[in-house]
């Protein structure tokens, strides 16, 4: 899978790029995904506008629906926005690495682009198992502090 990583924050994301590329490279997906690191203010703006929830969240996914809505061929799976600040706080709270939190959020966003949801317990468990599998491929686990 092809990913493009964009940084719209003042934080240095260079240490996380190789992990993210390594994590998504083996996934058999021919479309491009954009991972965009943003500020809490930006993600709150997006969350408010698109979901009518006026607070910052950790990750938002926006699938590319051009093919569906307009019948157009496009090579983009969609965009995943990650709040770097939110990831830092969540990693500290959960007592695991920022690397693991960013990887988790990126995978979570990717699965939403692929159509997975977690509205029910069954959907949640399916999504959790897929996240765990992808994270384990790069030596990260959901239940460990790494």
From Swiss-Prot:
* Stretch forming the signal peptide: none
State where it is primarily located.
Answer: cytoplasm
Q: How is the cofactor bound?
A: Binds 1 zinc ion.
Subcellular location per UniProt equals: Cytoplasm
Name the EC number(s): 3.1.-.-
Gene Ontology MF terms in the entry:
metalloendopeptidase activity; RNA endonuclease activity; zinc ion binding
Q: Name one GO biological process term.
A: rRNA processing
Record Pfam families: YbeY
Please tell me whether the keyword Ion transport is annotated for this protein: no
What are the GO cellular component annotations?
cytoplasm
State its cofactor.
Zn(2+)
- Report the enzyme's class at the first EC level: hydrolase
What domain of life?
A: Bacteria
**What does the UniProt keyword field contain?**
Cytoplasm, Endonuclease, Hydrolase, Metal-binding, Nuclease, Ribosome biogenesis, rRNA processing, Zinc
Q: Which family does it belong to?
A: Belongs to the endoribonuclease YbeY family.
What name appears for this protein in its UniProt entry? Answer: Endoribonuclease YbeY
UniProt organism field: Onion yellows phytoplasma (strain OY-M)
The gene coding this protein: ybeY
């Amino acid at each position: 899978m092809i990913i493009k990583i964009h940084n719209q924050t003042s934080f240095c994301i260079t240490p996380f790029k190789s992990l993210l590329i390594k994590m998504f490279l083996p996934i058999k997906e021919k479309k491009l995904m954009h991972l965009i690191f943003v500020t809490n203010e930006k993600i709150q703006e997006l969350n408010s506008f698109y979901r009518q929830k006026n607070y910052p969240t950790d990750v938002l996914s926006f699938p590319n629906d051009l093919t569906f809505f307009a019948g157009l061929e496009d090579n983009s799976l969609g965009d995943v926005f990650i709040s770097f600040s939110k990831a830092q706080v969540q990693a500290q709270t959960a007592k695991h690495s920022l690397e693991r939190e960013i990887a988790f959020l990126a995978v979570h966003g990717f699965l939403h682009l692929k159509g997975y949801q977690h509205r029910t317990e069954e959907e949640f468990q399916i999504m959790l198992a897929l996240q765990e599998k992808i994270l384990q491929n790069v030596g990260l686990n959901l239940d460990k502090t790494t």
